Amino acid sequence: MAKAIYFDMDGTVADLYGVPNWLHKLRTCDPTPYIEAKPLCDMKKLAEVCNILINGGYTIGIITWLSKDSTPDYDNAVTMAKIEWAQHHMPFINEFHAIPYGVPKHTVVKRYAEMWLVDDNADVRAEWETPKQRKTINANNDIVAELWKLVGR
């Protein structure tokens, strides 16, 4: 059975909102907050559980929105910054999707029999969920502990 887990970035695994002057920088088309953001969880522990999930058949990816107010050039810069962050902090991921702000996240990925989204936004989680196929993990909780539940620990 094909399975996948997707992570949101901003506010879920990357502390964008903790970067000084993040909003001003984004509004002036400065992508550096996406690189400067610190991880929101212990990335070694996240890598440990994700690698076990990968060995168990899961695809691990990121689905992240681009800036709300943007231009094509800024979208490219943000995408590159987010990829750089992901490669540094989450080198185990198999997929990366940077999509326009507000696009439903389930519309951009391949269908799997079991699909999880780890996200801090309740509305995004509600839009993702279905009774059988698509489930969510609230990133406001301990995401590493929640992922261990999928492993069976």
Language model features with spans:
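Conserved Lys-Pro-Asp/Glu-containing loop-to-beta segment of HAD-superfamily phosphomonoesterases
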Residues: H97-W128
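Alpha-helical substrate-recognition element adjacent to the catalytic core
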Residues: A4-W85
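A general structural motif
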Residues: M1-A2, G57, I93, Y112-E114
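Acidic, Mg2+-coordinating phosphoryl-transfer loop and its flanking beta/alpha structural elements
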Residues: W116-R153
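Acidic carboxylate-rich catalytic motifs and surrounding loops in phosphoryl-/glycosyl-chemistry enzymes
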Residues: T64-K68, N94-K105, N141
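Alpha-helical structural signal in soluble globular domains
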Residues: I52, W85-H89, E127, P131
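Structural recognition of alpha->loop->beta junctions
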Residues: K82-A98
